[in-house]
Amino acid sequence: MALVGRYNSLQVVKHTNFGLYLDGGADGEILLPNRYIPKDIPSEDEDWLNVFIYLDSEDKLLATTEKPKVQVGEFASLKVVEVNSIGVFLDWGLPKDLLLPYSEEKRQMTAGDYCVVHVYLDKHTRRITATARLDRYLDKTPATYSPGQEVDLLVAEATDMGFKAIINNKHWGLIHKNEIFKFMRSGMREKGFIKEVRADGKISLSLQPVGQEAASSLSSKILGKLRENDGTLAVSDKSDPALISSLFGVSKGNFKKAIGSLYKEGKIVIHADRIELT
């Protein structure tokens, strides 16, 4: 049986004037239309092709070599292209737009909005469907991340405390406001770092390396910018936090620690209005 909403490796069983038929096992033969057959891939009988399986507008299984923006079981930020009496329709990179039923909305959507969704397969109809109700699809088992571990983040929701983000397509985490030193919005994908896994299971995140690695990374960044600017930067431990954030994406406190260490190592000189290489 083919995995609907996922990539499948299927064998070519028949050529026709309008496409190739692939062996879908218990689902029978699945059509790969001519328009989805690249000229540079083999397509002889018994060849195996890597294709994405979905339902067409008549709810028939169809194969494509086009790449959707998200597969079943994954989270993504998708653009609303239409809202009608049936529900909200999202652009996910395939000709047939993805349905987000009204019952799966968290807020009212209009065309042009972006929405972070999980994509699942309806058990009764096998239709690929989106939901904005994310909690039920995130892992509730205790996470085993280590402090400082690099992870993939999908920023999902702004809160009073910062931004909730999905970690490695599995867990909720929180980027606290004091860890954010650049523009952020829901739907952004970022590299992040585990700051803390609390006893209650909640996970704190950072957008910068943490611990000793963070200090080393920031020190290297400061030295790099100094070398790029003839050994001088018009920023110091007395500078406005906004200037420091715009230059290095860190808090003033972390910046002061870094230049203090560089000063002790004899690599820079600190003035009231600038720092210089020695």
Question: What residues fall within each predicted segment?
Answer:
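Single-stranded RNA-binding regions, centering on S1/OB-family and related RNA-binding modules
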Residues: 1-278
